[in-house]
């Protein structure tokens, strides 16, 4: 029997509902909803009713019904104004037309070049640390993720080509994100966003023209997008190349930086597991050797730690869809116009799926335990046809950072109160201050 809509979570305020709590501490909101009502409950964001779902079965429906009864784009209009019509902000037709270009960017053969870029930039960062000192890993990972993206997508001359102000313009765009306010209001942050977009467009348009004039000199993201036919047989116009570049940077660099910082923090907080990681690195990573695909494939404990970090501290802890046609979820009929959200705060902590779910235990992903077999149990990289195209890129980047950092340095975690900072985009991490000492005989390049 189909019942009425799911029950409402407590704590809503007149007019605004749960909006403030959603923006400031959605983890507490979602966990309270689950405690009160189980795996299906309703919150109100202003006048907008939102169904929040928990568990792999409901997550599977969420992802498989996307582009059918669930619309992906309407929930991200604030992002569309910031980065343009690309990836999850694009219309269904545009997304499927662009998809061959996105697949080309992240195909397996290109991962070899990306891994090379990651090795170079990670080692440059490690060399810059000197023999000993202290570093805020959270900020360092933001800077490093920018450098990796620049070298991987633009090439070795990325610093000169992008210019010193590129990332400042990007930060102005990221700071403008606001899922509440209409994105075209004449506010200072939206004006700064629009000015930054113009400057970035000018920079990238010049790079595109250089590659049009001398295609033989380049083999990077832009040349890939200039030469890869779309589904309809056409080639991307320049404005769409700029948009895709911005979309990839936006979707990847902040989320990867946050996950990488949490990964290092969690390993330092759990020295017994860190010892397993260090032993694995010592066995499989030769001093002064670049990590290639063969080497990375042997770092099981590192990748299990990455998966456990995604479970416990996801940068993307929720995603949203709009109900276009009435849909039955469990015993409820969800009307058109509602929104639906997945919740890492609850799905990732189900005791029937993950043993001792609050504990950092990467070994849960080992084959003999197999807690990560259901692809819809964890939502950190999305799911279904829209699953993050750059997932392997991000995981490899985190693995290379982890392997080289702990290979070359003895470390001590100084920060004691490391917290998730929830924002209007990806979740961030508070300061992760680490004291380090270069190991005797550790390679130092340059």
How would you label these PLM feature ranges?
Residues 34, 122, 166-169, 173, ...:
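Cytochrome P450 proximal C-terminal region
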Residues 5-15, 115, 119, 216-223, ...:
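Cytochrome P450 I-helix active-site segment
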Residues 1-7, 15, 30, 71-78, ...:
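Cytochrome P450 heme-thiolate monooxygenase catalytic core
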Residues 16-38, 206, 289-330, 445:
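Conserved cytochrome P450 K-helix E-x-x-R motif and the immediately C-terminal K′/meander segment
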Residues 255-274, 278-280, 392-407:
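Cytochrome P450 catalytic-core helices
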Residues 342-369:
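Conserved cytochrome P450 K-helix/beta-meander segment immediately N-terminal to the heme-binding cysteine loop
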Residues 1-93, 97, 116-124, 377:
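N-terminal membrane-proximal hinge/A-helix region immediately C-terminal to the signal-anchor transmembrane segment
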């Amino acid at each position: 029997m189909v019942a009425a809509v799911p029950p409402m979570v407590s704590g809503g305020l007149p007019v605004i509902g749960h909006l403030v709590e959603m923006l400031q501490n959605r983890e507490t909101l979602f966990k309270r909803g689950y405690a009160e009502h189980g795996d299906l409950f309703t919150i109100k964001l202003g006048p907008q009713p939102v169904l929040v779902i928990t568990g792999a079965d409901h997550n599977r429906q969420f992802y498989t019904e996307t582009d059918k009864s669930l619309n992906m784009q309407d929930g991200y209009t604030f992002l569309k104004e910031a980065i343009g019509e690309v990836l999850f902000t694009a219309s269904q037709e545009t997304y499927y037309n662009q998809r061959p270009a996105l697949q080309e960017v992240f195909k397996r053969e290109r991962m070899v070049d990306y891994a090379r870029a990651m090795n170079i930039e990670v080692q440059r960062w490690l060399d810059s640390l000197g023999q000993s000192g202290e570093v805020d890993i959270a900020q360092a990972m933001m800077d490093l993720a920018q450098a990796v993206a620049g070298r991987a997508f633009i090439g070795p001359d990325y610093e000169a080509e992008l210019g010193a102000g590129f990332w400042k313009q990007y930060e102005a765009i990221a700071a403008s994100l606001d899922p509440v306010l209409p994105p075209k209001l004449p506010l200072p942050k939206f004006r700064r966003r629009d000015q930054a977009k113009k400057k970035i467009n000018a920079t990238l348009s010049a790079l595109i023209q250089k590659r049009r004039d001398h295609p033989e000199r380049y083999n990077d993201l832009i040349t890939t997008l200039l030469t890869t036919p779309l589904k309809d047989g056409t080639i991307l116009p320049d404005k769409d190349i700029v948009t895709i570049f911005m979309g990839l940077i936006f979707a990847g660099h902040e989320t990867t930086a946050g996950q990488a910082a949490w990964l290092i923090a969690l390993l330092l907080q759990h020295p017994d597991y860190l010892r397993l990681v260090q032993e694995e690195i010592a066995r499989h990573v030769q001093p002064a050797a670049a990590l290639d695909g063969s080497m990375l494939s042997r770092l099981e404990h590192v990748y299990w730690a990455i998966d456990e970090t995604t479970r416990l501290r996801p940068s993307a802890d929720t995603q949203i869809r709009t109900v276009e046609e009435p849909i039955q979820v469990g015993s409820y009929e969800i009307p058109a116009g509602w929104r639906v959200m997945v919740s890492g705060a609850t799905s990732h902590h189900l005791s029937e799926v993950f043993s001792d779910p609050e504990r950092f235990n990467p070994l849960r992903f080992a084959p003999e335990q197999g807690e990560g077999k259901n692809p819809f149990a964890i939502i950190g990289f999305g799911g279904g046809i829209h699953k993050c195209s750059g997932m392997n890129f991000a995981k490899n980047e985190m693995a290379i950072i982890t392997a080289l950092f702990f290979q070359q340095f003895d470390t001590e975690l100084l920060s004691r109160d490391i917290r998730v900072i929830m924002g209007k985009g990806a979740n961030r991490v508070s300061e992760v201050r680490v004291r380090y000492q270069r190991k005797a005989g550790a390679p130092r390049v340059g």
